[in-house]
Amino acid sequence: MGTGQTLLTIMAMLMLSRLILSVNTNTAQNGASIEMAAYRITASSLGFSIIEEASGLAFDQASVASNITATSQLSTTLGPETGEVYPNFNDFDDFNGLVKIDTVANSAVFKTTVVVQYVTVSGSSIVVSSTPTYSKQITVKVSSVSMSDTLIFQDVMSYWYFR
């Protein structure tokens, strides 16, 4: 083998090494992207589950057994009443202050925190209210050390009574 052939062989080996390194890097990056997508799907599922669960309950403790005809009948303190613990909540605002840790099989550990507030809805604007209103907003935050960001989900529940 002459000097030219040796040089060509070395260049071919370098190019092959670079190609293999590039393929491995892309495979690792794709694997990380797929893993992150799976974490986000799981986190979304956990967040929406809380919202769906809360939305299926009564609007307020005062509306569990009877109808509300004035905002003065609504609870001034949002959160679970004495003796109520998750998952045995009976109204929407019981979820206020909930912190839930979920470990999904073969996945990350997720922390879910919930805040419920009275809001005033006017057109497309939603403003937090310090006094009871016929609308409450739930904010669910799902985070994990395995994710680079926190997913935030919000929904508004309003009380409607028809005579």
Q: Where do the model's predicted regions map?
A:
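Aliphatic-rich helix starts adjacent to a transmembrane/signal segment
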Residues: 4-48
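Low-complexity, Gly/Pro-rich coil/beta segments used as flexible assembly/activation regions
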Residues: 41-163
